Amino acid sequence: MAEAVINDIDQSEDLIAERFFSSVYFGGGTPSLASVESIKKILDAVNNRLTGEETEITFEMNPNDVSTKKIDGLLMAGVNRISLGVQSYHDQELKALGRVHDSDSILEAKKILQDTNTTIDLMYGIEKQTPESFTSNLMLSLIHI
């Protein structure tokens, strides 16, 4: 995977040579399944051409994929923000979404990420969601801030 992305960067160099990226986002699907080594290779290629000290580099993760080792590796590779795909703190709602994580894994992931620049993705309008459960999701997310 990393080689294909780096190849695309190399082939696009003439188009992007004068550009500066203010943000880089690894998301859409499950980038957290990629190895830290692959992410580091991609970031090395990007950093050598397109980013600066203030570039925000975000990495989207499912709660089940968060581990101290993975987070430490991503931070060392240059990631400076984690986007955690919580969606809901209620197991019934997570089940309705077909998510593989549960509320316990969310809390464990948040504990690991407590000193990391983190955003949380929530969903509204989930089957079986109530106004009260969504309010609860918001409140539980605010605890992390």
What are these regions (language model features)?
Residues M1-L15, R19-L142:
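Conserved non-cysteine loop/helix-boundary elements of the Radical SAM core domain that shape
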